[in-house]
From Swiss-Prot:
Entry keyword Transport: no
Protein topology in the membrane: Single-pass membrane protein
Domain note: Intact BH3 motif is required by BIK, BID, BAK, BAD and BAX for their pro-apoptotic activity and for their interaction with anti-apoptotic members of the Bcl-2 family.
Location in the cell: Endomembrane system; Mitochondrion membrane
Protein name: Bcl-2-interacting killer
């Protein structure tokens, strides 16, 4: 049976030297006394550039493989969701959803402007801000009217 003894805070002082395992020694390791061959700096730089280029190519390939199928599906998903909303609620539901989305967008823009007060733009400074919104509403109304006629 082992005997109970006090342990020091430093574990190395507690364990006798003959009980400490020695690190394994490899037979073919070069000693520090052997001269290290000179490494050509240009070889390292060229090799590093090739590795970086190869890693960039691998990253681009992974990006294309993983992201492309999802990006291709987005327009189809948007049309499908619009069709489902139209079939469930009709044109009024689409307009209600559009108005709710635009209201949420306006509230989000307002909250960001409150957080960054230096970025405020008064309406008379840029009258062209209204044009894209009017164009978007006009296109959506035209598309809904086209769907109603079919």
């Amino acid at each position: 049976m082992s005997e109970a003894r006090l342990m020091a805070r430093d574990v190395i002082k507690t364990v006798p030297h003959d009980q400490v395992p020695q690190p394994p020694v490899a037979s073919e390791t070069p000693s520090m006394k052997e001269p290290v061959r000179d490494v050509d700096l240009m070889e390292c730089v060229e090799g590093r550039n090739q590795v970086a280029l190869r890693l960039a190519c691998i990253g681009d390939e992974m990006d294309l493989c993983l992201r492309s199928p999802r990006l291709v599906q987005l327009p189809g998903i948007a049309i499908h969701r619009l069709a489902v909303t139209y079939s469930r609620t009709g044109v009024r539901g689409i307009f209600r959803s559009l108005i709710r989305s635009l209201t949420n967008l306006r509230e989000n823009i307002w909250s960001w402007r409150v957080l960054t007060p230096g970025a405020w733009v008064s309406p008379d400074q840029d009258p062209g801000q209204l044009f894209p919104m009017v164009l978007l509403v006009f296109l959506l109304l035209g598309g809904a009217w086209y769907l109603q006629l079919q």
